[in-house]
From Swiss-Prot:
Protein name in the entry: Mediator of RNA polymerase II transcription subunit 6
UniProt superkingdom: Eukaryota
Annotated stretches, region: Disordered: 172-213, 271-323
Biased composition (Basic residues): 314-323
Keywords: Activator, Nucleus, Transcription, Transcription regulation
Low complexity bias: start-end ranges: 276-285
An annotated Gene Ontology molecular function: transcription coregulator activity
GO terms for biological process, alphabetical: regulation of transcription by RNA polymerase II
Function: Component of the Mediator complex, a coactivator involved in the regulated transcription of nearly all RNA polymerase II-dependent genes. Mediator functions as a bridge to convey information from gene-specific regulatory proteins to the basal RNA polymerase II transcription machinery. Mediator is recruited to promoters by direct interactions with regulatory proteins and serves as a scaffold for the assembly of a functional preinitiation complex with RNA polymerase II and the general transcription factors.
């Protein structure tokens, strides 16, 4: 049994116009196998070669090479490696009345097979390889393993190039993890309860929005190397602008109110009502406490009127001095 065909034979195209001219100028059913015998695909140890040599030196075998039917009929009585025509375009288009059902093509199919005789049973035929002839060009049909291997290699090559390109795309953010595209912000639904209280009066930007904006700015600065310094300056100015506009605002659902040491948790609506209803308290004047000391016989500097007991004492003292 012949070995497996060489893989390099699948890449060969063979043609010989001089041999076609020697065989009558065109290929037909009776000379197609002899034209194939001139190609490198032919095996000189096959039954075809031995039968052709016998016909050249033995007149009894001459009629076997005159027609393809007689040649292949003789090959069926032999055991071993052989080449037979699997598809004849002329026979495929011929009809019993001698006319053609369609225009015959110029494609022939030849099989390389091994025949083994079995007593009382049909011959065991194993197909080793297939060849096809288009015009005067002979090709070897690729095996199934070669076709599947080529497709797998093409797929792996494409996946390798894809992974090389995709390896530079992922970005990481604490809120979304590893992503290939910047995360899109979800629009808040005003109809849902609780969303109104979570929104700031001045539309405070969300942390994800700042992260997405900074990520886009960083990506653009890496792509455009010439304008990196200008982009950095613009980013810094935007940061200061956001700090100036929203630096004193918070997104706490229950903000802290009160003085240091006595903070109280309250809701946003309660805080607004309290601040709107309560007028601003005026700061009390802080000064040194005054203590009044009354000296006997001396009137207060501010001219304050003494009390009743003090007036009686003063009168008694004046009476004693007068007496």
């Amino acid at each position: 049994m012949a070995g497996t065909p060489d893989a390099s034979m699948e890449e060969i195209l063979w043609r010989s116009p001089p041999h076609v001219q020697m065989m009558g100028g065109y290929l037909h059913s009776n000379n197609i196998l002899f034209y194939f015998a001139e190609s490198p695909f032919f095996d000189p140890t096959s039954n075809n070669a031995s039968l052709a040599i016998q016909a050249n030196y033995n007149e009894a075998f001459r009629h076997f090479v005159e027609t393809r039917e007689a040649f292949e009929g003789r090959l069926k009585t032999m055991q071993g490696l052989e080449f037979v025509v699997s598809y004849d375009p002329i026979q495929a288009a011929a009809q019993p009345d001698g006319r053609f059902a369609h225009e015959p093509s110029n494609i022939w199919v030849i099989r390389k097979q091994n025949r083994r005789k079995r007593t009382g049973l049909d011959d065991e035929v194993a197909v080793l390889s297939t060849y096809f002839i288009v015009g005067d060009c002979i090709y070897m049909a690729p095996s199934v393993a070669s076709v599947v291997g080529n497709r797998i290699l093409s797929a792996v090559t494409s996946l390798t190039s894809l992974l090389k390109t995709a390896s530079t795309l992922p970005t990481f953010t604490p809120s979304h993890g590893h992503t290939y595209m910047p995360p899109a912000l979800k629009q808040a639904d005003a109809s849902q309860p609780g969303t109104q209280s979570q929104q700031s009066k001045e539309n405070t930007p969300l942390p994800d929005a700042d992260a997405a904006g900074k990520a886009s700015l960083v990506g653009s600065s890496q792509m455009v190397g010439a304008g990196s310094s200008l982009q950095d300056t613009r980013t810094l100015a935007e940061s200061f602008n956001l700090l100036r506009r929203y630096g004193d605002e918070f997104m706490d659902e229950h903000p802290l109110v009160g003085e240091p040491g006595s903070f109280i948790l309250s809701r946003v609506n309660d805080t607004d009502r309290t601040s709107a209803a309560k007028p601003p308290a005026t700061a009390a004047k802080v000064g040194t406490p005054q203590v009044r000391v009354d000296t006997p016989g001396k009137v207060s500097e501010k001219g304050a009127t003494p009390s009743g007991s003090e007036e009686n004492k003063m009168r008694k003292k004046k009476t004693k001095v007068g007496s």
